[in-house]
Amino acid sequence: CFPGNCPDS
């Protein structure tokens, strides 16, 4: 994922 774009799950 990208910085600040990663899913919480």
UniProtKB/Swiss-Prot annotation:
Post-translation changes: It is unsure whether Ser-9 is amidated or not, it is why the two forms have been synthesized. The non-amidated form shows a very weak agonist activity on the zebrafish vasopressin receptor 1Ab (V1a1R) (EC(50)=117 uM). The state of the C-terminal residue does not impact its 3D-structure.
Keyword Disulfide bond assigned: yes
Molecular-function GO terms, alphabetical: toxin activity
GO cellular component terms given for this protein: extracellular region
Subcellular localization: Secreted
Tissue expression: Expressed by the venom duct.
Site for Aromatic residue important for selectivity towards vasopressin receptors, residues: P3
Disulfide cysteine pairs (residue numbers): C1-C6
Location (main, coarse): secreted
Residues flagged as site, Non-basic residue surely responsible of very weak activity: D8
The record's note on its domains: The cysteine framework is C-C. This synthetic peptide shows multiple conformations, possibly due to cis-trans isomerization.
Stated role: Shows reduced activity on vasopressin-oxytocin related receptors. Is more active on fish receptors, than on their human counterpart, supporting an evolved role of this conopressin in the envenomation process. Shows weak agonist activity on the zebrafish vasopressin receptor 1Ab (V1a1R) (EC(50)=13.6 uM). Also has weaker agonist activity on the human vasopressin receptor AVPR1B (EC(50)=38.2 uM). Has no effect on all other receptors tested.
Family to which the UniProt record says this protein belongs: Belongs to the vasopressin/oxytocin family.
Protein name per its UniProtKB record: Conopressin-M1
Native species: Conus miliaris
